[in-house]
Amino acid sequence: GGGSPQDTCKAIGIISNNPEFADVRSLEGLSPTNKPSVPILAIPTTAGTAAEVTINYVITDEEKRRKFVCVDPHDIPQVAFIDADMMDGMPPALKAATGVDALTHAIEGYITRGAWALTDALHIKAIEIIAGALRGSVAGDKDAGEEMALGQYVAGMGFSNVGLGLVHGMAHPLGAFYNTPHGVANAILLPHVMRYNADFTGEKYRDIARVMGVK
């Protein structure tokens, strides 16, 4: 499925082998589990979250109207089938929203303080792929859809190692409190956060502009 079904599956997989953490809220932050998840085979149906390759999962506490992140290297699926045909059923609006989520992953991962040479290479390539394919994917172009499937996966491999930034830090409460779709929340916040960070990330923003074809 998309990010939420895959994250739910990852939480269930962890709790199945670590029943002492049956209340998923006890896993918030850096999870203290001792045993790996039951084997998970992930098949993403959206091109955005990269939940199939990341060490974290996001859970919504509907009672408190908040989202919280659990980080656990035990929860990475053992196998991921990334097939763009599985993503064809997305309506254009969902393709746009999940695509912006993937782009935000790549941009935030590229400029985060923990970034290093390997993650920089992954993120800048992901930005290039996504920027070149997102519009075509939304319009229904199958080749562009395949590129989006690849780009979101590459971004996931990067940010899973270094984390994200202020966009996601604000998008989670915005989504939980106002029920704003996650990709839409990212789209609202990304331009403002990039402007806020511009004084400190100018060189990397130039890299981003270059691979996006901005002149």
Specify the residue positions occupied by each region the protein language model found.
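Glycine/threonine-rich beta-strand-loop-alpha-helix active-site module
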Residues: 2-82
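Buried hydrophobic packing segments
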Residues: 8-13, 106-107, 130-133, 152-156, ...
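Short, glycine- and charge-enriched coil/turn segments that flank and shape catalytic ligand pockets
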Residues: 20-21, 136-143, 213-215
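Glycine-rich phosphate/pyrophosphate-binding beta-alpha loops
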Residues: 48, 153-186
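Carboxylate- and glycine-rich phosphate/diphosphate-binding segment that chelates Mg2+/Mn2+
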Residues: 56-162
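Gly/Pro-rich interdomain helix-loop hinge
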Residues: 176-215
